[in-house]
Every structure is written in C-alpha cells, then in structure tokens.
Amino acid sequence: MAAAVGIPVATGEIHSSRGDFRDIIATMAARILQPDAGVLGGISEWMKVAHTAASFDLPVAPHWHADLHIHLVGAVSNALTVEYFFLEEDIYNFERILRERLVPSHGQIRIPDRPGLGLVLDEAAIERFAVR
C-alpha cells in the first residue's frame, strides 16, 4: 500500500518488537515509523528501532506519551515530531499522575532539563490509583 499511495504511510504504534519494525523496513511498508517506548519494551528498544530507522533514512515520530518521548526525539537525528494529545477524559491516566505536564507553545515542546525523563510525579494522585 505504501508504494501505491502518494503520501507517506506511518505505522508502528502498536508494534511490540524490533522484529516487527525490521519487517516494516524490509518490506518498505511505511515511510515513517511510530515506535512507542511503552509498548516496545522501554527506552533501549525504542532507541534501537530509531537508530535502525535512521540507517535506512526513515524518520521516527513516536506514538503518544509526549512526556516520555520528548527526550528520546531529542536524542536521535531522525525524529520528525512528537505526538501530543490533550488530556482525554476516561481514556488515559498517565497525565493524571504528573504534577507538571508538558504544554506546547507555538507548536513546540521544550525538552525539560530535569534529571532522567524530567517527569514530576504527583504522589497524591498516584495514591488515588493504589490498589490495596
């Protein structure tokens, strides 16, 4: 399909292994890869996919989790964009446990300079999700 349409095809948001991305690349099934570190198995696996994509001149545009992926796109040369979703009620709880959330300004997100992933967790919010 990717070869038949005149627009770049993007995929990868639900793929959970490097092998899946290897197959996408080998068959030229997409021109933009959308790995998700939360689905793929973490940061190391995401970086391996991004570097493999770069070796084939393919960009990555990670799926969802801007708070997680913003640092990753800043660390690779082939990042196209970072996907950003405004809070979707009753669908996604990750933003609800953050004390500070990344907010775009003029279409851009500034990479936090805090240690690690730069996340500031809301301990009280985390407690509300605890199962005892």
Model-derived regions: residue spans:
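C-terminal extensions of enzymes
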Residues: Y92-R132
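Shared catalytic-loop signature of beta/alpha-barrel
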Residues: M1-Q108
